[in-house]
UniProtKB/Swiss-Prot annotation:
Keywords annotated in UniProt: Cytoplasm, Nucleus, Phosphoprotein, Ribonucleoprotein, Ribosomal protein
Lineage of producing organism: Eukaryota, Metazoa, Chordata, Craniata, Vertebrata
Compartment(s): Cytoplasm; Nucleus, Nucleolus
Keyword Nucleus tagged: yes
GO terms of biological process kind: cytoplasmic translation; ribosomal small subunit biogenesis
Name by which UniProt lists this protein: Small ribosomal subunit protein eS6
GO cellular component terms attached to this protein's record: cytoplasm; nucleolus; ribosome; small-subunit processome
């Protein structure tokens, strides 16, 4: 089995192949996200603690968190699920995934170093890979440089050097996202004002409609009462004429 080990503190990653089954037994029957002591891997791993972050079986099917089995299952996956990327909006697909419990049928097991041990691992903890890009979001820049809300974030942006032969060296800065500027606040005020205007307009229209409805219902009621009174007058007139005719006979 191969072990794909990463160390986030240095940004390094190393793939090692372990032939001895006894060294791997410490990982068997463990679930994803479990922290395991890496001492059985060798003397250089003494004191190291690693977290199981995933893996793939011999056919390439990935492990999925929350599927409590050793084997493979077919799940109906949609947007937001791990092990699946939808190609269309709202698309769902039944995919084969492996359970989150480690066993001997895996070809690669992904591990993340949680605690460093006594010795350095060559190519993993002795070297540091600098990040290619700095943070882009305003809140993350503040967090990186421990800035307050009053500080100007734009002065602390990590710039990327662009070196070209025969040209003056220059740097490139990313566009800061979620930066609160006077223009953003103005847009927010305008949105709130427009919303208030819409609410007021809807209220006025609703009250006008209610008045019109009341007026129409009142008119309809008066008209109905007039018709009833007219019918009564006609019926009484007919009754009186029939009485007079009968008396003459």
């Amino acid at each position: 089995m191969k072990l794909n080990i990463s160390f986030p503190a240095t940004g390094c990653q190393k793939l090692i192949e372990v032939e001895d089954e006894r060294k791997l037994r410490t990982f068997y029957e463990k679930r994803m996200a479990t922290e395991v002591a890496a001492d059985p891997l060798g003397d250089e791993w003494k004191g190291y603690v690693v977290r199981i972050s995933g893996g793939n079986d011999k056919q390439g099917f990935p492990m999925k968190q929350g599927v409590l089995t050793h084997g493979r299952v077919r799940l109906l996956l949609s947007k937001g699920h791990s092990c699946y990327r939808p190609r269309r909006t709202g698309e769902r697909k039944r995919k084969s995934v492996r359970g989150c419990i480690v066993d001997a049928n895996l070809s690669v097991l992904n591990l993340v170093i949680v605690r460093k041990g006594e010795k350095d691992i060559p190519g993993l903890t002795d070297n540091t890979v600098p990040r290619r890009l700095g943070p882009k979001r305003a809140s993350r820049i503040r967090k990186l440089f421990n800035l307050s809300k009053e500080d100007d974030v734009r002065q602390y942006v990590v710039r990327k050097p662009l070196a070209k032969e025969g040209k003056k060296p220059r740097t490139k800065a990313p566009k800061i996202q979620r930066l609160v500027t006077p223009r953003v606040l103005q847009h927010k005020r305008r949105r709130i004002a427009l919303k208030k205007q819409r609410t007021q307009k809807n209220k006025e229209e609703a009250s006008e409609y209610a008045k019109l409805l009341a007026k129409r219902s009142k008119e309809a009621k008066e008209k109905r009462q007039e018709q009833i009174a007219k019918r009564r007058r006609l019926s009484s007139l007919r009754a009186s004429t029939s009485k007079s005719e009968s008396s003459q006979k």
